[in-house]
């Protein structure tokens, strides 16, 4: 009788890379739709521009490296990076910033390390942080949510201002940022931090128009709920595991709740941290990147909790309004150490 020797893996499932990436992209849709409803068509344009740039940049790089271009592009990893980057950027960020961030994410943060599976840092967050450090003013220039906007923008208006810097009627981004009260608009996290440092109390800050309907800011709670729905969908499908999102959110909520209980006149309420900024996007779509996150169950819990702690620290004491991107990248640095000390012991051997 002939014995056939086979190599691993001995079991297979349908979780191919191409399909996983596609499901993650589809899970972003609820949050993206909420963004479009409250902040206009800008993020859709950014996603489209980033996607085209990512595919071109990855195709050129693969060609120079003598890799199979069509086969590699078909894994949808470049497309997912572009989508995550596009929905993270301000809706009306200039086109050249989107192109710059995407090229940096694909070529420097991904392909320079060897491509998918080799990069130690999340490419989308690398691209985002490059822009945040280089162009902080543009990266914190968000439109007021739809109920507070003085000028309604069509798809064509958004497209024109992204590529020219002004609407067809001549309105600049600075003019569009003013809400119905004539006050320059920022994100809820940025507004809360800036107002708190200027001496205002949390009670006074929450009287501002953007907090009229929600402690997390008009529109932002629905954007986060949209990404939460998408994240729960990924959990039910088994595309991601629960360890990182749960430990991330619990860590963030614990820090926010404890500080608020101790000094409610100096710290933001927990709901502002939970349902504002990029909290749910970071918890379910960015921190769970299988390439750059920890690979053990205990390690994932530590990794997620570390990100939650860093997000709270940066939001509370840092110079930037939101800390998800920096927190994820800093946690990426610790992954080898976390995996080393949390790897399961092989039977019959010491760790």
UniProtKB/Swiss-Prot annotation:
Cofactor(s), by name: FMN
GO cellular component, one term: plasma membrane
Pfam family, one: NQR2_RnfD_RnfE
Enzyme Commission number(s): 7.-.-.-
Claim: Electron transport is one of the keywords in the record: yes
HAMAP family: RsxD_RnfD
Assembly and binders: The complex is composed of six subunits: RnfA, RnfB, RnfC, RnfD, RnfE and RnfG.
Family to which the UniProt record says this protein belongs: Belongs to the NqrB/RnfD family.
Name the record gives this protein: Ion-translocating oxidoreductase complex subunit D
Gene: rnfD
